[in-house]
């Protein structure tokens, strides 16, 4: 559209062109409709932030943010807590994001006073300033069709000045008006019933028009659209139980969605480091937080992002993408091979997508294929038949992965981009007890007040109470510290309960004893360890065989009501660097944040399991461990671990205590390999802001009993992975902005690098047989990436840390 301004004489004074759009917005029966379709708003709060330029954000970063929102299945931006540059509103229009445009108005003193009758929000002398800050936003932005809501401000109480701003905005524009403080103060300055950091019980109450006793004025009794303007506080290792929030919203009477707090970490580079070009330490961004500067600050509290300060995708965002996905895979009937699909897009049919499926046997892909999607209308269900032929063999776990992919390139992603995923179990894992086959005889000796178990190839030594002091096989030291009960975890979401006893940096064991028994046939030694303490009673039943294998049958009885983890830890040598595992992955996941993680066989290193959270904390967990190979890649020896029961694991070059005590990621020094094998771990939750505790179903119940089995088998001469599924070991290193892949590579092999959202960022094909291949990763933000290697022997998925 071209706009021309003329003077009184009819002469043209000024002309400009602008894009413009038309759409209808209506609130009906407590829900929001756009062009006649009910819409749920799946979003995040977006701040102006850049690690180099602070609050000045360049066009490239704006475009990147908008595209990443789309890639993560988000459709809504709340401009917390001020309007964006007008050019970014134009990006929302072009790429297709709904916007809650928020006025630059925030005064916490009024908010903290509880609102309606106190502070400047209620003083006549401030009326003009309140109205001015709001109406100038409307005047500037009202021609952007992407703006669906006006927001009057943030955390400023609910005084009468918001009544004036509401009236002024309503006189200018008919769009819905939002103000969270109105809900908090029980006033009528909002068309939306809005909350911050609600409990799930509050979502259920207020999204269904119920009242509660949290505040005397709380309760969505008018049946307004219910919106979580801030929720799922993404500080550090966070965003637990997001699925439950959306189950509640989608099943409610008035729920219309919410915006996660928030999009990007707000770390910055120090001015001196910028001047000196000193941006990294050992490959880690040298970011600063409030703790690095004098004066009032909130430490790390502004690092609440779903992406890093330089916009690297996080494991949290991958879970968000899964929960927000528009296409739901409702069920799969293995007998008929029929997949029931629901299209929850509001305006898009599914003929622009195709379905890709893969069958995995014990984590290894054995079959794949592609199926065309029918033209399924928005908000309709349909059935797709998957023509795979693979069948399960005895004891083999069989899984089915499905992915919905874009047929053509989008403005925000390339062709083949995956917008929705799901996984189904076709055959359960083997649960039979382990059969130990150690050949040779053992000797059990009492030495120096402890015990020694040895054979012709191995030796273990123990203290009298069962503590393992050494484990040597074929002359190789396999441990730095033997298995011990461990309950310690520290993430920022646990801070509200940090005063509880389980935050003691020791494991709280008060008594521990052991019995040692050599079997009559001398083929095994049995060690039974019983211990009790403040947090847990446990029994470890060790079975040791002559080849150096160790079977641990563990039973735990939990004492406290808020335990963080129940399991064991041990420390391996620092050069046990290479990792192959069969569990949920390839990125970090937890019991309440596993969406988008798929059970499969993955490859990485201990160094690459690290996640660059600005404030170091416990991390790297993988749920559902089946088996694991941890080894020294230079000398080809290490440890194989197999499990029975529910086991989660993590491997890092840092202890949890080291992570807690460190102020910055870039201050950490790599050490030995710290391994956790947990029977249970508390969910991550959302506790770093608001009284949002981990859901009961993701807690470790007080008095609960847990059990699992771990079989540790020393291995040597490693040239292939577990099950001999690889032809060779591939090793990845990042050197001068290049990813270097080392190993045997043939002409038929190819490599592709993806961020954790599935965006392909680099690829290379092998032109001739080689033992090294380089891929440039220049310009990519530091973070975790997925390398998919396709060889004649199969497809292998590696996680690397750039």
Predicted regions and their residues:
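A short tyrosine-centered beta-strand micro-motif
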Residues: 1-2, 398, 785-788
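Terminal connector regions
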Residues: 3-5, 12-15, 390-430
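Extended substrate-binding grooves/exosites of carbohydrate-active enzymes
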Residues: 12-340, 346-351, 356-364
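Short edge beta-strand/loop segments characteristic of extracellular beta-sandwich folds
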Residues: 338-346, 555, 738-744
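A short beta-turn/strand-edge loop motif at beta-sheet boundaries
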Residues: 346-353, 560-563, 743-750
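Intrinsically disordered, low-complexity Pro/Gly/Ser/Thr-rich segments with frequent PxxP/GP/PP motifs
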Residues: 363-396
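Beta-strand/loop-rich accessory regions of lumenal/periplasmic or secreted enzymes
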Residues: 387-395, 410, 424-717
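C-terminal outer-membrane/trafficking sorting elements
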Residues: 724-802
């Amino acid at each position: 559209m071209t706009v021309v301004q003329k003077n009184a004489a009819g002469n043209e004074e000024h002309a400009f062109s602008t894009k413009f759009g038309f759409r209808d917005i209506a609130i009906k029966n407590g829900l929001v409709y756009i062009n006649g379709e009910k819409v749920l708003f799946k979003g995040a709060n977006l701040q102006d932030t850049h690690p180099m330029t602070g609050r000045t954000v360049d066009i490239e970063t704006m475009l990147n943010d908008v595209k990443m929102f789309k890639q993560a299945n988000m459709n809504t931006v709340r401009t917390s807590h001020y309007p964006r540059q007008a050019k970014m509103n134009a990006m929302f229009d072009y790429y297709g994001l709904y916007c809650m445009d928020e006025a630059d108005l925030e005064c916490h003193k009024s908010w903290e006073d509880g609102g309606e009758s106190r502070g400047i929000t209620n003083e006549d002398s401030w009326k003009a300033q309140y109205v001015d800050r709001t109406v100038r936003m409307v005047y500037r932005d009202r021609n952007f069709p992407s703006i669906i809501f006006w927001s009057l401000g943030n955390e400023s109480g609910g005084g009468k000045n918001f009544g004036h701003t509401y009236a002024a905005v309503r006189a200018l524009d008919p769009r819905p008006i939002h103000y969270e403080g109105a809900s908090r103060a029980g006033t009528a300055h909002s068309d939306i019933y809005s909350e911050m950091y609600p409990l799930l019980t509050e979502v259920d109450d207020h999204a269904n028009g119920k009242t509660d006793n949290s505040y005397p004025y709380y309760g969505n009794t008018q049946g307004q659209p219910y919106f979580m303007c801030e929720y799922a506080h993404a500080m550090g290792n966070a965003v637990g139980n997001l699925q439950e929030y959306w189950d509640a919203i989608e099943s409610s009477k008035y729920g219309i969605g919410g915006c996660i707090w928030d999009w990007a970490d707000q770390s910055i580079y120090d001015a001196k480091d910028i001047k000196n070009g000193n941006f990294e330490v050992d490959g880690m961004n040298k970011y600063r937080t409030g703790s690095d500067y004098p004066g009032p600050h909130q430490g790390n509290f502004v690092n609440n992002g779903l992406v890093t300060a330089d916009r690297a995708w996080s494991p949290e965002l991958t879970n968000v993408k899964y929960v927000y996905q528009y296409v739901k895979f409702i069920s799969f009937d293995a007998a008929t091979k029929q997949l029931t699909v629901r299209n929850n897009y509001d305006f898009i049919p599914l003929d622009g997508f195709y379905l890709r499926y893969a069958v995995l046997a014990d984590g290894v892909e054995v079959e794949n294929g592609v199926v065309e999607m029918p033209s399924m209308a928005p908000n309709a269900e349909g059935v797709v038949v998957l023509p795979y032929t693979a069948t399960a063999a005895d004891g083999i776990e069989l899984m089915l992965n499905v992915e919905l992919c874009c047929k053509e390139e989008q403005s925000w992603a390339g062709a083949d981009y995956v917008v929705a995923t799901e996984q189904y179990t076709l055959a359960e894992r083997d649960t039979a007890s382990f059969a130990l086959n150690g050949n040779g005889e053992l000797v059990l000796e009492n030495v120096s007040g402890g015990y020694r178990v040895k054979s012709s190839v191995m030796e273990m030594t123990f203290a009298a109470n069962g503590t393992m002091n050494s484990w040597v096989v074929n002359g190789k030291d396999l441990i730095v510290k033997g298995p011990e009960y461990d309950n310690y975890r520290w993430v920022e979401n646990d801070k509200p309960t940090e005063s509880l006893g389980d935050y003691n940096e020791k494991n709280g064991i008060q008594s521990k004893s052991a019995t040692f028994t050599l079997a009559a046939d001398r083929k095994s030694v049995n060690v039974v360890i019983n211990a009790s303490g403040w947090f847990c009673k446990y029994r470890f039943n060790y079975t040791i065989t002559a080849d150096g294998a160790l079977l641990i049958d563990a039973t735990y009885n939990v004492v406290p009501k808020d335990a963080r983890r129940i399991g064991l830890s041990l420390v391996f040598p620092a050069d046990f660097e290479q990792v192959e595992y069969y569990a949920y992955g390839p990125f970090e996941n937890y019991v309440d944040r596993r969406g988008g993680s798929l059970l499969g066989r993955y490859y990485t290193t201990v160094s690459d399991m690290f996640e660059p959270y600005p404030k170091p904390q416990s991390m790297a967990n993988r749920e559902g461990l089946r088996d694991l190979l941890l080894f020294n890649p230079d000398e080809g020896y290490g440890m194989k671990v197999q499990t029975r029961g529910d086991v989660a694991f993590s491997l890092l070059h840092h202890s949890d205590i080291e992570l807690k005590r460190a102020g910055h990621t870039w201050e950490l020094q790599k050490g030995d390999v710290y391994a956790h094998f947990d029977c249970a771990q508390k969910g991550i939750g959302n506790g770093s802001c608001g009284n949002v505790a981990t859901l009961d179903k993701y807690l470790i119940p007080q008095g609960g009993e847990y059990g699992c089995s771990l079989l540790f088998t020393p291995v040597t001469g490693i040239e292939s992975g577990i099950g001999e599924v690889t032809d060779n070991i591939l090793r990845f290193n990042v050197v001068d902005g290049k990813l270097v892949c080392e190993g045997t590579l043939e002409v038929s092999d190819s490599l592709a690098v993806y961020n954790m959202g599935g965006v392909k960022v680099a690829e290379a094909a092998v032109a001739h047989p080689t033992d090294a291949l380089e891929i440039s990763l220049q310009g990519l933000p530091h973070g975790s990436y997925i390398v998919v290697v396709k060889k004649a022997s199969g497809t292998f998925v590696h996680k690397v840390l750039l």
